[in-house]
C-alpha cells in the first residue's frame, strides 16, 4: 500500500465531506505528524526573509554602482559597468546553465508541474539575477524573485520530505509571500492560487496556501519598513470623474492591448536576431550589453527596469513632449525584448509599466482634460493583462500602484474586461492569417 493510500484510509472523510482533498494527505497522521499548513507558514517566512535580503543587497549594490556622482556625470562609464556584467551573464548561461527567460515564464511554470522546479539552480538564480540587473539591462527584479522563491520551496519540500502532490502549496506560498512583500499588498498574488491552476483539486490546495503565504510576506516586508508599490506614481488628478470615463477607459484598455501586441512583435524581431547566436551565449549577452551601453550613453533614463526612472518622467512629462514619450515607450519595449532574448534573467513588469505610463502621459499632454489616472489605469491594465493572462492579479496590481478608490477600480475592471473580450478575436484573426500563408 502506498503512503497516499494509507493516508486516505486513516482520514475521517465522512466528517468533512471533502474526501478528495483530504485523501491527498492534508491531515495529521502518525506517519506525518506535522500538518501541511505548518510547512506552508515556514516556507512563507523563509521566502519573504530570503527575498527581502536579496532585494536589499541588490538595491545597495545598484546604488553604489550607478547612483554615484561620478557615474551620473560621465555617461561614458555606462559600458565600463555594463559590459563586464553582461559578460558574466553570458558565462553563467553558457558554462553553468544559469536560468534565463528564454523558455517559459514564472507564471507558466506555476500553471504547470511545479515538481519540475530545479532547486539546485538556486545559487545560479541568485547570481544571474543580480548580474542581469547590475548590467543596466531593461529587465525587472520580479523574474529573479520568482525563481528564488519557488526554488526555496522546492528545496524545502524535498529535504523535509513533503509529498509530491502537496509541494505546489509550498511553491504558491513562497511566490505569494515574495510578491506580496514586493508590492506591499496582502492580497495581490494571493489570487494566483485561484487563477493559474487548471486542476480543481490543485486549486483547492493552492488558494489557501497563496493567501496564507501572501499575508505573511506582506507582514514581513511591512515590519522591515518596505513601502512597496503603494501609490507608486504619486498622481494628484484634479478633475472629477465623468460619465464619459466609462467609455474612455475601454478605449485606453484596448490601446494597452495594441501596446502589448507591439511588444510581441518586438519580441519576435529580437528572437530572430538573437536566435542566430544559439550555442554562442557569451557573444549573445555581450551584443546585448553593447546595445544597452549605447543607449545608456545617450539616454540612461531608458535603461534599467524603469521602476524609479518612470517617477522622474511622471514628475515632468512636458519636458519630453508627446512624440518623445511615445518613442521612449517603444525603445523601452525593444530593449526589454533584447534583454529577454539574449539570456538575461528578470521580469517584464516594470519595463511594461514604464512604456504604458509614457504612452498615457503623451496622451495626457495632448488631451489634458482627461484624468491622468484613468489614462494610466486603462493602458497599464490592458497591456499587463495580455502579458500575464491573470485578470484579478492585474486589476489588483494596477489598483495598488494608483492607490485606486472604488471609482477608479471599477474603471480598471472595465478596461481589463474589454481586453479579455477582444483578445480572442484578435488571436483568431492572427491564427487565420498564419494558416493561410503558403508553407
Task: Please state what every model-predicted region is.
Residues 1-439:
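Alpha-helical transmembrane segments and immediately membrane-proximal extracytoplasmic
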